Amino acid sequence: MDFLNDHINVFGLIAALVILVLTIYESSSLIKEMRDSKSQGELMENGHLIDGIGEFANNVPVGWIASFMCTIVWAFWYFFFGYPLNSFSQIGQYNEEVKAHNQKFEAKWKNLGQKELVDMGQGIFLVHCSQCHGITAEGLHGSAQNLVRWGKEEGIMDTIKHGSKGMDYLAGEMPAMELDEKDAKAIASYVMAEISSVKKTKNPQLIDKGKELFESMGCTGCHGNDGKGLQENQVLAADLTTYGTENFLRNILTHGKKGNIGHMPSFKYKNFSDLQVKALPEFIQSLKPLED
């Protein structure tokens, strides 16, 4: 009887029983009246008369009047008090239930180690992401983002080479930049070591050159000197300080992203917990590009 724990189910069951009882009572009353009643009363002077059958000048039945009045009162309550002013919805109730569950989930798994986080992220990826990005996370031959390279220097190099689209920033789509691989690697090293919160690069010797190229090639025009992408308190371009972190991924999961093929939808409706959002980039960061 778990379904009785939901007050909507209880209300529906009670309403169904009331309707059933009233239907049986009214049906039996009408059947009895049809069997025992005799024609009586005055016919309406201007009423309908068809084949000798006329219309009595009777008042509207009390039951009809009561039904009409109850319907009007219910409609007034529904539109002005019950909904939408009280703002109840099944989606809202679902979100509250998921929020409560996420709090229990966070408390239960708050002390996860690195390996457990990676395993959790892998589970989330296989269920929600692998359909488009592939089991290996390589993007199914370009149909989706190659997540093996995302969040790393290789991902920045791909963006420099091919450009970026689909996040609807004020600066528009980032075009591909005509840089050779060495210069692209230098910029990627600088971004990962000095701008991104990751603060780590495989090529520390390229940081200084990468900084010069970052400023001279026009990257600061959209992303700013600090890489935050802000100009006069407006979000002009991607915030590179969050690249490779859960905050960057959270933004994509919340807003979705247009790709070369199709459109990645927003996953906001999934109501991922903070721990799940943290676990997903941990798994992605654990993946190693084939070049390595």
Curated annotation (Swiss-Prot):
Pfam families: Cytochrome_CBB3 (PF13442), FixP_N (PF14715). It is a multi-pass membrane protein. Keywords: Cell inner membrane, Cell membrane, Electron transport, Heme, Hydrogen ion transport, Ion transport, Iron, Membrane, Metal-binding, Oxidoreductase, Repeat, Respiratory chain, Transmembrane, Transmembrane helix, Transport. It is found in: Cell inner membrane. Signal peptide: none annotated. Residues 116-195, 205-288 form the Cytochrome c domain. InterPro entries: CcoP_N, CcoP_N_sf, Cyt_c-like_dom, Cyt_c-like_dom_sf, Cyt_c_oxidase_cbb3_su3, Cytochrome_c_Oxidase_Subunit. Binds 2 heme C groups per subunit. PROSITE patterns: CYTC (PS51007). Heme c 2 binds at residues 174, 219, 222-223. Its main location: membrane. One of its GO terms (cellular component) is plasma membrane. One of its GO terms (molecular function) is oxidoreductase activity. The keyword Transport applies. Its cofactor is heme c. The chain crosses the membrane at residues 11-31, 62-82. Pathway: Energy metabolism; oxidative phosphorylation. NCBIfam families: ccoP. Belongs to the CcoP / FixP family. This is Cbb3-type cytochrome c oxidase subunit CcoP. It comes from Helicobacter pylori.
